[in-house]
Design a protein with these regions (language model features):
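Phosphate- and other anionic-substrate recognition elements at nucleic-acid/protein interfaces
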Residues: 1-152
Length: 152
């Protein structure tokens, strides 16, 4: 029986943080951010060099989300990848989209480290790195009218 020669994108296999991203990959999204969504706070990673602090924590209250969006604008971020964790991603997603960012919602199972220690800082940096190299696929997000109907 002949083996298949078809290659599968790394992200569909669920990339492990222990596997380094090959150096020969081209940076697709140079001004990309990664957000690790949590119930009480969100950790945000931006590329090294665009600010003094590459990772910041923002609480999940509305004023903090506006501060998050403002900080991303100051850093020159154009596109953002975030996990679809529970319902906590919804306010962040909607606010960032409203502010003009290209936002990708990604399945947390595709970007999580399967084994080993996990920290929110490492997670947001990993999401940012994968998004920089174009290795993340965004989840389907229906039109605003459908989202409004689903909220009832």
């Amino acid at each position: 029986m002949k083996k298949s020669t078809r290659t599968t994108p790394l992200v569909s296999k669920g990339i492990s943080k222990t596997e380094p991203i090959p150096k020969h990959l081209e940076q697709i999204n140079q001004w990309a951010a990664g957000i690790d969504i949590g119930a009480t706070s969100h950790f945000v990673a931006v590329p090294e060099g665009c600010t003094t602090t590459a990772v910041r924590e923002f609480k999940s209250f509305t004023p903090d989300l506006y501060s998050l969006a403002e900080w991303l604008k100051e850093c020159g971020i154009q596109t953002i990848a975030m996990e679809s964790t529970g319902v906590y991603w919804i306010p962040v997603y909607e606010l960032l989209e409203e502010k003009g960012f290209e936002v990708k919602l990604v399945d947390a199972r595709r970007v999580k480290n399967v084994s080993g220690r996990k920290t929110d800082v490492l997670d947001c940096q990993w999401i940012q790195q994968l998004h920089t190299y174009g290795l993340l696929n965004g989840a389907f997000r229906p039109d605003n009218e459908i989202c409004a109907l689903r909220s009832y």
